[in-house]
Amino acid sequence: MMTMQNFRVRSIKEDDINEWFRLRKLLWDESSDAEHKAEMLDIYEHTDSQLVLFAETEDGKLVGFLEASIRPFVEDCHSDHVGYLEGWFVEPDYRQYGIGRKLVRSAEIWARNKGCEEMASDSEIGNDLSFKAHLNLGYEETSRLVHLRKDLV
């Protein structure tokens, strides 16, 4: 049986790229491979304002990840330097062991060390699992937003 002690949270290493790609595709399956690779390159080149963390089991398997950033503006926040949870994911077989919580707490410490006084995130309307996970970690709903578009051609 897995326990909270059977994994560790660590920063990205160069040889994590393939596993990072695999985990990203599980979280954001609507993005193309090219979009993932472009975003990953951008994140990897801006480690001053971007963070990637992994949850690694004792046997070296990456079972979760988190991406965070520092944003100059976030809706409904009071400061202009905000830590932002871009996304986090834990493989289904490894959920309910505190892995997501530890990933998020590690990102919050990183943001605090970067001078942030607030941490923010988002969750798509209808993604109840994500919304409840945020609430369980102490985040509060500030607003709901639906994006709209129209072709002008």
Show which residues each predicted segment covers.
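A short beta-loop-alpha structural element at the N-terminal edge
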Residues: 7-20
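Conserved beta-strand in the GNAT
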Residues: 54, 61-70, 84, 89
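A conserved beta-turn-beta hairpin within the catalytic core of GNAT-like acetyltransferases
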Residues: 72-85, 95, 142-143
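Conserved active-site alpha-helix within GNAT-family acetyltransferase domains
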Residues: 101, 113, 125-143
